């Protein structure tokens, strides 16, 4: 059995789905289950490095367009020495050398730059060809040349995918504002057809499982729904699928329209599973099995090394309007009137940063509320007493899980689905009643009152309750959920564990 994940997204900002996929990779790896994470478009070096930094491994990545070649591996194996010989380079040509790159300069002013792979010592990931300082071509390497990109005015206009002997198996070319694709002697005019051909190359079997993390406006969705192969197909929900007013999230319109073509649905929480069952019943699609699997895990519970600073609160997320961090700022500013030593730190980056900075200044709260930017939070969480979220819906809430794993008391709205999953009223924090129709002034006041109430309480029981809850999300426990789910699906027998 192989589990295929569609897809590792290229061309968009990092998000929680990326982290969820990396967690899944680790869980399946721990079970010894073969897994492939599919790039349906060729990633930039920066995007590939990002996914590898999350914990993905080269051998678990599947590049759709390379399926049309006879390449056996994409793991970097070409050494610097081997490529120097192929390019007939000498040490005298080297003009710059760092841990990550080697630059070779020629008498005519042209240059080559070898970019080394940090995970495979002395191996080259890609080579840039430079003309008068401008990149004109880039070659990617595994055991041999995999892909060549051609640049014009800093952008790729042609990309070729090679067989092991260097000949071209598949080609992408940009013509005006659209891309055309050449497979052998055949011209394909849309990427959906390319994905259809790719799926036929996979030779999917009945015991294989395909997981879709996204379907809306994805050119692989229709070919997957129409696939003749006997493999199973599951949709993983990462967002709210039905809003409080009963409207379906447009992101899942396609999924509900063709719901009966899915074998399984997967949610991140039991709460969303319950709501999804009701939604499917209203759509006349009862009977499709739904499983709840956490989309994140904790390697360990993080203890505080000393006393946590008193009256310390943080939040962490993308600085995005949907996260409503502006409400969190107003909550803390209001609570600060009764808790004059209250300190609130906001971690994360995003387009809302300037607006939030202006709001802090408008409220004259610069001394108590701070934008801290991006940071590795693992050792930061234990330096705080409480975590505040004002997001109005979270399908899981990775930072809530992490904060609970560091023993923080939690505060937020009683809104689907992550908050009531991780915040247990009066045990490890407080939930404020929430509805889309409630005035924001009321929401801010009630949450500010709860924040004051929290800091007037003995926090030790709250911290312990968070640790107790978070223990359910330790890697070994989440891995067991995956094991039980795959066995219940019939995709995994006991003898395969």
Residue locations for each model-derived region?
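A short, active-site helix/loop in glycosyltransferases that binds the activated sugar's phosphate group
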Residues: 258-287
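A conserved mid-protein helix/loop that constitutes part of the nucleotide-sugar donor-binding site
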Residues: 318-337, 351-354
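A short, well-ordered alpha-helix in the C-terminal region of glycosyltransferases
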Residues: 365, 453, 460-473
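Short hydrophobic beta-strand element within catalytic cores of glycosyltransferases
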Residues: 409-413
């Amino acid at each position: 059995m192989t589990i295929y994940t569609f897809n590792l997204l290229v061309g968009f900002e990092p998000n929680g789905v990326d982290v969820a996929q990396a967690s899944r990779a680790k869980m399946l790896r721990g079970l010894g289950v073969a897994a492939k994470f599919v790039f349906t478009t060729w990633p930039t070096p920066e995007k590939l490095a990002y996914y590898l930094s999350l914990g993905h491994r080269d051998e678990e990545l599947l590049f759709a367009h390379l399926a049309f070649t006879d390449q056996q591996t994409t793991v970097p194996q070409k050494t610097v020495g081997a490529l120097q010989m192929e390019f007939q380079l000498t040490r005298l040509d080297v003009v710059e050398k760092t841990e990550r790159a080697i630059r070779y300069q020629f008498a005519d002013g042209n240059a080559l730059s070898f970019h080394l792979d940090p995970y495979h010592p002395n191996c080259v990931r890609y080579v840039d060809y430079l003309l008068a300082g401008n990149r004109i071509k880039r070659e990617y390497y595994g055991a041999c040349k995999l892909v060549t990109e051609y640049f014009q005015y800093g952008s790729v206009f042609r990309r070729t995918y090679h067989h092991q002997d260097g000949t071209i198996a598949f080609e992408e070319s940009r013509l005006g504002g659209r891309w055309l694709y050449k497979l052998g002697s055949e011209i394909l005019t849309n990427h959906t057809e390319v994905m259809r051909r790719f799926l036929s190359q996979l030779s999917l079997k009945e015991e294989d499982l395909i997981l879709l993390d996204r379907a809306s406006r994805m050119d692989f969705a229709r070919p997957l729904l129409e696939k003749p192969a006997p493999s199973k197909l599951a949709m993983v929900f990462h967002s709210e699928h039905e809003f409080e007013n009963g409207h379906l999230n447009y992101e899942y319109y396609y999924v509900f329209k063709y719901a009966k073509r899915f074998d399984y649905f997967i949610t991140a929480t039991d709460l969303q599973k319950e709501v999804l069952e009701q939604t499917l019943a209203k759509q006349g699609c009862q009977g499709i099995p739904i499983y709840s699997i956490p989309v994140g895990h904790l390697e360990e519970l993080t203890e505080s090394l000393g006393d946590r600073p008193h009256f310390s609160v943080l939040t962490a997320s993308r600085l995005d309007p949907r996260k409503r961090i502006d409400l969190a700022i107003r909550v803390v500013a209001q609570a600060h009137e009764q808790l004059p030593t209250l300190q609130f730190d906001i971690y994360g980056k995003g387009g809302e940063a300037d607006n939030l900075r202006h709001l802090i200044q408008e409220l004259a709260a610069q001394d108590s509320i701070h934008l801290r930017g991006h940071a590795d939070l693992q050792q930061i969480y234990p330096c705080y007493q409480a975590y505040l979220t004002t997001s109005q819906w979270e399908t899981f809430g990775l930072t809530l899980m992490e904060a609970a794993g560091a023993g923080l008391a939690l505060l937020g709205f009683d809104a689907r689905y992550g908050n009531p999953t991780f915040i247990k009223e009066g045990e490890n924090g407080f939930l404020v009643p929430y509805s889309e129709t409630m005035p924001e002034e009321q929401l801010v006041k009630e949450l500010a009152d709860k924040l004051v109430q929290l800091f007037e309480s003995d926090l030790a029981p709250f911290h312990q309750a968070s640790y107790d809850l978070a223990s359910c999300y330790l890697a070994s426990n989440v891995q067991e959920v995956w094991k039980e789910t795959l066995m219940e699906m019939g995709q995994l027998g006991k003898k395969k564990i």
